[in-house]
């Protein structure tokens, strides 16, 4: 077992050097971009009829049957769509995971789907989220149930390796709302090399790192849960694979870190701290003020915690590169109880029968800033009625000396996408480009929420929230498609050379003339799951991007041309 500790400063120095070596080739390549190759044209759309309740989340495609499997968490089912004609997606049937409940297991709903070689895998949480979940396996040909594998607590994402040998689930292990039960996060590794019937199931855990908590936190891994061990606090979120299918990369979103898993041994071999984004640097600004109702992107003495949600991988010059969507995610746990029980537990009574057991979020205006680090003018600008005081930041980072005065300000997410090498070193970050592009192309509808059309509404809380990422090749170019959850748009970047990506286009299928409360007529809201289908595998012979939109409950098919 090895432990990778990548501090912010050391990681930045390494990344800069790498970019200098390979960047020259990238410039020549970018000159040849044909932006039409990255153009997204909507050709089909399916509406689940469920609005603002997860009607379309994660999507998976089976090329042998032209079926699309869509997680419909609002109905606790998997919608099975026929996309033989992509312009007319048609619902064939639904799979109800509750049909497979047994005496020893009661399902709480499906969270994720993946397809490989005629098999559909579904990540299923237990009715009690802190209990062990399951991976259900079905045949894609007849939708018949095949088997179930025991996973960890709250399997949130499921994925096959490209060669089909391994099936993994990222088991988030979230605590109960009253924080009385905090199960360990883990990764379930199913070895399918001997076939489904003879599969070997292993649980890759983090218990070996429990004795290394100080080293991890010193390196920048966030271990912040009350009384939590390392294994309890780490929350695996999303999965991608190395190009040789020997290693899996798992985002640990709340921990601002990346886990490396050796698949052959089903062992976590490293935890990499992802560092922090310096928003005071040119090209890395942010708009943290929602009160001016207009985009004003500034450099401020604030750090962004990358905290990626989705991750995807691709090959460049024989090596694996990882792309992350740096959404950010705080922790806030609220449960229902009376005020006496709440206060006796040492928790915060919110009134109305609600009790706060734990939160790592605070408004910037409520953070005591160290006057020895921040000037009086900076403190005034950030806290005294300027609008920046509403910015959501954390109360668990920035007070290194423990004197209750914060030397650093740390916000959730980085409002960007990043590219990392196999060692978890950053080789590219999009800086403030996403906010700048939306500000330029849609200034009156900047940093919207996905459930209201109020401009600047999300500037104080993670901005456009880049959440989803898919990678695909069209011709000789490789593109990254970045889903903006709150803004409800898709950014397209040419990432053929990971050291010098280039912006291609911004696409939004949201109708801003319609109030989101009016339902499906508002267009596509809240892109969650995204997959790229190559022209070779596509039903119409054209490259496709398919997006599940969780708020509008729609599944949208784009042709990439």
What do the predicted segments below correspond to?
Residues 33-561:
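Beta-sheet-rich non-transmembrane sensory/scaffold domains
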Residues 8-35:
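Collagen/collagen-like triple-helix recognition
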């Amino acid at each position: 077992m090895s432990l990778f500790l990548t501090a912010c400063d050391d990681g930045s120095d390494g990344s800069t050097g790498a970019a200098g070596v390979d960047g020259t080739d990238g410039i020549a390549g970018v000159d040849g971009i044909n932006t039409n190759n990255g153009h997204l044209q909507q050709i089909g759309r399916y509406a689940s009829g469920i609005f603002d309740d997860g009607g379309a989340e994660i999507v998976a495609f089976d090329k042998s049957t032209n079926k699309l499997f869509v997680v419909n968490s609002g109905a606790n089912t998997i919608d099975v769509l026929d996309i033989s004609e992509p312009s007319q997606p048609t619902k064939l049937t639904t799979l109800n995971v509750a049909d497979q409940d047994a005496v020893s297991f009661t399902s709480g709903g499906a969270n994720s789907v993946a397809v490989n070689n005629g098999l559909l895998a579904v990540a299923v949480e237990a009715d009690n989220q802190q209990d062990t979940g399951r991976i259900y396996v079905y045949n894609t040909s007849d939708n018949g149930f095949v088997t179930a594998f025991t996973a960890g607590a709250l399997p949130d994402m499921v994925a096959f390796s490209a060669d089909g040998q391994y099936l993994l689930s990222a088991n988030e292990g979230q605590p109960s709302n009253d924080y009385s039960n905090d199960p360990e996060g883990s990764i379930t590794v199913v070895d399918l090399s001997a076939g489904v019937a003879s599969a070997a199931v292993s649980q890759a855990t983090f218990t070996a790192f429990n004795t290394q908590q100080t080293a991890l936190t010193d390196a920048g891994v966030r271990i912040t849960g009350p009384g939590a061990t390392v294994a309890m606090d780490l929350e695996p979120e999303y999965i991608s694979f190395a190009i040789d299918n020997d290693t899996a990369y798992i985002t640990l979103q709340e921990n601002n870190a990346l886990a490396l898993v050796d698949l052959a041994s089903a062992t976590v071999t490293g935890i990499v701290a992802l560092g922090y984004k310096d928003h005071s640097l040119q090209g890395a600004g942010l708009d943290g003020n929602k009160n001016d109702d207009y985009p004003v992107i500034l450099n401020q003495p604030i750090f962004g915690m990358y905290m990626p949600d989705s991750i995807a991988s691709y090959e460049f010059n024989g090596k694996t590169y990882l792309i992350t969507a740096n959404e950010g995610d705080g922790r806030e746990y609220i449960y229902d109880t009376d005020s006496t029980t709440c206060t006796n537990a040492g928790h915060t009574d919110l009134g109305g029968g609600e009790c706060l057991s734990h939160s790592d979020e605070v408004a910037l205006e409520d953070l005591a800033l160290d006057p020895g680090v921040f000037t009086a003018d900076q403190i005034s600008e950030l806290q005294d009625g300027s609008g920046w005081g509403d910015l959501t930041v954390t109360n668990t980072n920035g007070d290194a000396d423990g004197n209750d005065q914060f030397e650093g300000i740390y916000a959730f997410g980085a409002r960007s996408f990043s590219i990392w090498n196999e060692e978890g070193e950053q080789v590219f970050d999009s800086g403030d480009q996403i906010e700048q592009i939306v500000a330029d192309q849609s200034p009156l509808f900047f940093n919207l929420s996905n459930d209201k059309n109020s401009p600047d509404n999300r500037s104080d809380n993670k901005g456009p929230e880049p959440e989803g990422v898919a990678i695909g090749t069209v011709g000789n170019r490789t593109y990254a498609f970045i889903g903006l959850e709150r803004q409800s748009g898709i950014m397209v970047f040419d990432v053929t050379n990971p050291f010098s990506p280039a912006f291609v286009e911004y696409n939004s299928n949201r109708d801003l003339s319609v109030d989101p409360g009016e339902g499906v007529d508002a267009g596509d809201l809240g892109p969650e799951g995204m997959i790229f289908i190559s022209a070779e595998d596509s039903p119409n012979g054209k490259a496709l991007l398919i997006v599940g939109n969780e708020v509008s409950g729609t599944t949208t098919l784009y042709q990439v041309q």
